[in-house]
Amino acid sequence: MRKVAIVAALEREVSGLTRNWNRVERQYDGRRFVFLERGEVVVACGGIGLDAARRAAEAVIVLYHPTQLHSVGFAGALIPELHVGDLIAASVVIDARDGSRAFVAGADNQSSLVTYMSVAGVQQKKNLAHAFGAKAVDMEAAAVAAAAVAHGIPFAATKVISDESNFELPEMARFIDPQGRFKTANFALFAALRPWLWRRVVLLAANSRKATRALSEHLELWVQDLSRVSEPVAATSGSHAEGGK
């Protein structure tokens, strides 16, 4: 079976999959990375955001020499038809900064995923849907796709909806540090002092648990089937400023 690398932002996004996997710490480019290994599959949890995802993707490529790179994790819905726990296998990943696109060769759907540089609120979700015609938004996939294209490695992206198109997330961007780590304790204190946020925070936590279960169940089956799946074709990239799927 080929070596497959999965890149996620946070361990909790894939906790159901990696609960009993081997945990390894390795250094790359002066930084410490945690990898979760089982057989020919390795998971790198590099942190939230484009920079963190780029670093994690480069590290896992150089250290493990995978034959496929897979971006997984949470995403926000841009269309009302998508609900918490729904999965989206992207056929194209769009970088909102410049409109560049990475196409997943062999994808049998028309699901566009756009990567945005910050946490997207309801209005920003509407703007992204209008500008790019995408179905969902995340904060990492475009960076992972760019690394895959640069190294000539096949790429895929599977995301699970953790917040629906009309769900206004609490203020979260300020609690993401430069390394892409979420400062949970700081956020908890911030929310605890603001009773008007409690309902949203409780719902967010429940949504995150549901999303984690759905993604982990999907990935468990995917990992089991890897040995029976033919080698994928490398992703291709292009630059298009206009929107559309």
Predicted feature descriptions by range:
Residues 3, 27-245:
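Glycine-rich phosphate- or other oxyanion-binding loops that anchor nucleotides, phosphorylated ligands
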Residues 21-27:
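Short linear motifs in intrinsically disordered
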